[in-house]
């Protein structure tokens, strides 16, 4: 037994700060993992959230997944990480941490009577979960200056920016 434990992120300043520090140190994270998106989703869209963490025996954060509960007549009840964006899946220091976050997400889905869970990652997970490639993302590396960026676009596109 490794001593890892899953819990729900609270609202204290210390917990939120630890979450954001973990996100900023992770190469797997996107800006959408930052805790500020929790407030945006709850306050602007009215969707409840459940941000899960994995902590070691010493209490240090070693994994997380931001989950949002969505319910609609058309799509049913489900948890997604994260809605409205293509990134926001699990981040963990170990495969065991990922497994614990998956188990925590499944438990939350049961509590909320959710029909499925969507975890949005850039790369496929090493899991038995069903995977889909219906989402498409496009990225553009940013050059050193705004002027260099504009030079890379055709003139018609530049006039629309």
Predicted regions and their residues:
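N-acyltransferase acceptor-side catalytic subdomain
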Residues: 1-161
